[in-house]
Amino acid sequence: MIIKPRVRGFICVTTHPAGCAASVREQIAYVARRGPIERGPKKVLVIGASTGYGLAARIAAAFGAGAATLGVFFERAPADAKPGTAGWYNSAAFHDEAAARGLQATSVNGDAFSDEIKHKTIDAIRRDLGQVDLVVYSAAAPRRTHPKTGVTHQSTLKPIGHAVRLRGIDTDNEAIKETLLQPATPDEIADTVAVMGGEDWRMWIDALDAAGVLADGAKTTAFTYLGEQVTHDIYWNGSIGEAKKDLDRTVLALRGKLAARGGDARVSVLKAVVTQASSAIPMMPLYLSLLFKVMKARGTHEGCIEQVDGLLRDSLYGAQPHVDAEGRLRADRLELDPAVQARVLELWDQVTDDNLYTLTDFAGYKAEFLRLFGFGIDGVDYDAPVEPNVRIPNLIE
């Protein structure tokens, strides 16, 4: 079938298998050009492994360090001529490329928040890897059913204590708009922490440790975004910020647990990139469009693979890791360059409907958004029929 992009709001409801595969190959090629990751991990579990930063971590570990990988994700398979999700096709392509290079790859498809998927993952580690020496936590979901209580918690993107008016882009109409966000209630804050805080990461590490599948010296990291002044009202100072603070508290306990066996636990702070999640946040398309414009002009623009490959080489396995005062690994230094942030702030209120394409890189933002779903990738013929029914080998469901 011939597959074209169909966008509804902040979701593209179609995905292109060949485009997703080409995107994965591009990321692999980037890692390969940088050469081997010295003293890198050899057996890696990635929780949230099918898109964005989690996929980039799996690619960097496998094709940079030669690691065997086990990826956990929750994706929809193609069925009845309906394409699967982008994460499904990304993972299928990863398996194909890993197999071609003799790299062990196993994947588990299901709800990473559940006890069932944790148990299936542990069984797969025992069977295929024995133990893991790196656990990357990159799960991103709007809701979580708690495995012990059965309660489903829904995360909320709201300020705390007062309403906040945010500038942004109505991406459907390509117009500047303002959104008034009301403050979160105590229950909404608690629910957001339950979904996006550190509890599930801790549950994973506790389960892996109790099962004896964490190697001595094992490391774990959870990915997060903090941002700077322009995004603080809804990130660090909002409901999501409370979840991020919970992550910072959780990592201290995990670090103590792993340090006893020569290991480590860190929160890794990454730069803002286009994801399905970020595109749904009222101010982020405008912020990203301005950030792209400024960073591309300076030659410092990076995407997921550049960020995570650098994180592994420079900090997780580097001799001189970039660590902040709270003990987090920082890969967002170029975004937070004072000159970059000052220029973004300077332009923020100047953007109008008329100059959207000149003052910002909204065109680049839209292109990155479509790339998430396999569209706009160099070398792919989008007028040619493509087979949507792609399977993932070694898949556990």
UniProtKB/Swiss-Prot annotation:
Coiled-coil positions = none
Any one GO MF annotation of this record: trans-2-enoyl-CoA reductase (NADH) activity
Residue stretches spanning the membrane: none
Please describe the quaternary structure of this protein: Monomer.
Q: Which organism is it from?
A: Burkholderia pseudomallei (strain 1710b)
- Keyword NAD present in the record's keywords: the answer is yes
Q: Name one Pfam family in it.
A: Eno-Rase_FAD_bd
Q: For binding substrate, which residues are annotated in this chain's numbering?
A: 225
Q: What does this protein do?
A: Involved in the final reduction of the elongation cycle of fatty acid synthesis (FAS II). Catalyzes the reduction of a carbon-carbon double bond in an enoyl moiety that is covalently linked to an acyl carrier protein (ACP).
Q: Its catalytic activity?
A: a 2,3-saturated acyl-[ACP] + NAD(+) = a (2E)-enoyl-[ACP] + NADH + H(+)
Q: Kindly provide the name given to this protein in its UniProt entry.
A: Enoyl-[acyl-carrier-protein] reductase [NADH]
- List of catalytic residues: 235
Gene symbol?
fabV
Keywords in UniProt for this one?
Answer: Fatty acid biosynthesis, Fatty acid metabolism, Lipid biosynthesis, Lipid metabolism, NAD, Oxidoreductase
Q: Where is this site: Plays an important role in discriminating NADH against NADPH?
A: 75
Top-level EC class: oxidoreductase
Pathway-wise, it operates in: Lipid metabolism; fatty acid biosynthesis
Cite the EC number. 1.3.1.9
